[in-house]
Structure formats: structure tokens, C-alpha cells
């Protein structure tokens, strides 16, 4: 890292001697933290991070559970544009789907939480050892964000289907308590005896199964996908082939 420091890179976080996260702006992360600090509140603050590709009734249930258990819920939407549903749409659907919860503060994750910089294997589906290192680095950055916002708990949805997210959750529950942050795993909301998942929603959008979508999406997301505005996104999903891990 000293070599990159000489080239004008600045360290943000490191995992022992295996990984270092650096950026080429002197105050990029500092400015991001100062911006976040404007939304810092007294009382119990918690965090939730979601990709929401797209925002489902499962996501809404998770946000409602977390919001009910704290004074302020900081909800970070993954802003890396590596998903079938573009970030601008994902954020809009999250915002619409949580509008009834006054104590939820929405944030963009920027390049600092689950991004190609901190956690590339989230998008690449790498092997376990690589995922482990990237997850630890991502969480090392997150603990600095948590300190800026006085966050003492992070909520996650139970993850039976995805190896990457399941491993990330496991490492989170090991690492965050060391930084004084409780890790709360919430059982998934079900429809017809199955956990609601965004991958099932993408499959239904691809095949045009609107009956199933009515059971999986909040009205706000459903209205969007039925509108002419959604046509470019639907075309992208229809043409994507395998949409399960996307």
C-alpha cells in the first residue's frame, strides 16, 4: 500500500495484511462521511443495506421490521450499476415502497458499501476464500460509516438461496459485534410457502407472470412495472437469458 500511497492513493480500510481499500481522492471517503453525519440522530440508530433488484414485499417487510425496532433506520441502496434493474429505478422503487415509514433515511451506498471496489465478488460470484476477504473489507468500511451515524445494529434478511449473500451474512454476524454493532437476521417473508426473492420476481417479469407478481411486489413496484416507463427495463429483463443471479 506504500507504493500506491506514493502514487497518490489514500487508504480507507484494510483487512489484516491481505486487502487494502484505497482511493485516488484525498477526501472522497471523508466527504462521504461528513455528508452522512448531517443525518445523524440521537436515540437508537440501525442500518440496512439492500440491492433491491427490484424492491419486493420481502424487502418492504424487512424494512418495516427494522424500522419498528429503532428510532432511525439508515437504509443504504447499493448504487453500483451491475444489476438488471438500473440504480435509478431501484432507488425510486425503494423510496416509494418505504414512504409510509417516517423514521427511514435513504442513502446511496456510493463506492463504499457492496461495490466493485469493496466487494467485487458480490457481483462476480467468486469462490469462498475470495468472498471472505472481500466481505471483511466491505464490513471494515461499513464500521466507519456506522461510527459516523451512531449505528448500533445492522439488519439483514435471512439468505437460504445465495451462497455469496449467505456467507456475507455469516461473516457480518462474526465481525460486526467486535465493533459494537449488533447483527440482526430477520427470517424471510413468504408467499405460498416460499421465501419471497428478487430473483423469482425477475423470472416472473421475464415470463410475464403478473398473477404471481401481485403476490410478490408492493403496489408501488407493481404500478411501476405496469407503466410505459418500465418498458426499457422489462425489455432488458426479457432479453437477459438467465436472470436468477443477476
How should these model regions be labeled?
Residues 3-246:
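Nucleotidyltransferase catalytic core that binds NTPs
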Amino acid at each position: 500500500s506504500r507504493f500506491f500511497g506514493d502514487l497518490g492513493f489514500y487508504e480507507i480500510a484494510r483487512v489484516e495484511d491481505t486487502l487494502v481499500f484505497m482511493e485516488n481522492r484525498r477526501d472522497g471517503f471523508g466527504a462521504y462521511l461528513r455528508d452522512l453525519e448531517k443525518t445523524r440522530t440521537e436515540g437508537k440508530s440501525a442500518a440496512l443495506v439492500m440491492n433491491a433488484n427490484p424492491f419486493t414485499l420481502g424487502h418492504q417487510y424487512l424494512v418495516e421490521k427494522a424500522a419498528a425496532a429503532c428510532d432511525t433506520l439508515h437504509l443504504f441502496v447499493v448504487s453500483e450499476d451491475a444489476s438488471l434493474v438500473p440504480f435509478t429505478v431501484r432507488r425510486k422503487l425503494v423510496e416509494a415502497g418505504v414512504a409510509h415509514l417516517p423514521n427511514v433515511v435513504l442513502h446511496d451506498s456510493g463506492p463504499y458499501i457492496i461495490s466493485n471496489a469493496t466487494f467485487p465478488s458480490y457481483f462476480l460470484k467468486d469462490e469462498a476464500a475470495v468472498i471472505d476477504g472481500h466481505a471483511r473489507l466491505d464490513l471494515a468500511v461499513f464500521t466507519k460509516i456506522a461510527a459516523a451515524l451512531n449505528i448500533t445494529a445492522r439488519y439483514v434478511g435471512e439468505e437460504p438461496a445465495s451462497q455469496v449473500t449467505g456467507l456475507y451474512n455469516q461473516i457480518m454476524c462474526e465481525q460486526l459485534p467486535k465493533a459494537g454493532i449488533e447483527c440482526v437476521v430477520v427470517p424471510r417473508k413468504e408467499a405460498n410457502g416460499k421465501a419471497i426473492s428478487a430473483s423469482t420476481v425477475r423470472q416472473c417479469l421475464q415470463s410475464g407472470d403478473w398473477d404471481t407478481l401481485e403476490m410478490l411486489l408492493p403496489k408501488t413496484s407493481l404500478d411501476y412495472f405496469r407503466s410505459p416507463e418500465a418498458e426499457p427495463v422489462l425489455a432488458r429483463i426479457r432479453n437477459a437469458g438467465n436472470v436468477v443471479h443477476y
